[in-house]
Amino acid sequence: VSSLEEIDQLKEICNKTGKIIFPVFQYRYGPGFSKLKALIKSELAGKPLVASLETHWNRGKEYYSKAWRGTWKGEQGGAILSHSIHIHDLITMIFGPVSSIYAKLSTRVNDIEVEDCAAISLEMGNGALVTSSITLGAAEDVSRIKICFSNLTVESGGSPDKPYNPADDTWKFLAREPVTQNQIDEVLSNVQLTKSWYAGMFEEIGKNLDGLTSDEVTLSDARQSLEFVTAVYDSSNQGKNINMPIEKGNPLYKSWIPKK
């Protein structure tokens, strides 16, 4: 699937047949996000304020030596689609839908067709503001998340050992008055940790298939991610802020891949 049109067609087929598609967003599963969800549910976190996201990875000549990589035909996109789609899914999982996007994309690291650097500014539907910094020209692979709520600051460790599974990294959860650190720590001590990464994802799919309460990724979640990608390319192409949602009349609804 490489367009909103295609995923809407899939949703229509699922609705008609009763079949279920389980998209793959394995970053959602692990102790870091289990703890954050518990704090949000406890209402200790408070109002979402801002967040910063970093996808700073190292992809050079060896990675792009395969002819299909770095091309619109082979990958349907660059770092926005192939490398940072998961971290953007995470922020929508935490903060909810995006309201507007402004994006600047550039190819600064490799001699390829698609982008390998980006700076993105988001306004969320709840009013929170988010920045996302992306490059494939870093010395090592690091995925880092920092989120500020009115009563809580959360930061993932950004370890180069966990770039593809940030939920398994070491996280900080710091209280801000009037909430105390003891209150935060008490919630954290009672969190039942889930399985991480693919194991966690497939466990939730299994629960769904067994008719149990589950937290699987839905096709609507996947559509939200593709709408994000579409808006990023639209913003970069036009050099302006793009409001969500993306309507069917948008020129990129059928495909964000540039026409030759």
List the predicted regions and their residue ranges.
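Beta-strand-loop-alpha-helix segment that lines the small-molecule cofactor/substrate pocket
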Residues: V1-R28, E43
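Predominantly a Rossmann-like dinucleotide-binding segment in NAD(P)-dependent oxidoreductases
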Residues: Y27-D111, G239
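C-terminal capping/lid region of NAD(P)-dependent oxidoreductase domains
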Residues: K19, G46-V50, D234-K260
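Active-site beta-strand termini and strand-to-loop segments that position acidic
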Residues: I120-G127, I147-F149
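Glycine-rich phosphate/pyrophosphate-binding beta-alpha loops
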Residues: I85, S133-D141
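C-terminal glycine/acidic-rich active-site capping loop/insertion
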Residues: K146-S220, I242, K248-K260
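Aromatic/hydrophobic pocket-lining residues that form π-stacking "cages" and hydrophobic walls in ligand
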Residues: L10, L36, A231-V232
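Short, hydrophobic alpha-helical segments
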Residues: F95, F202-T213, T230-N237
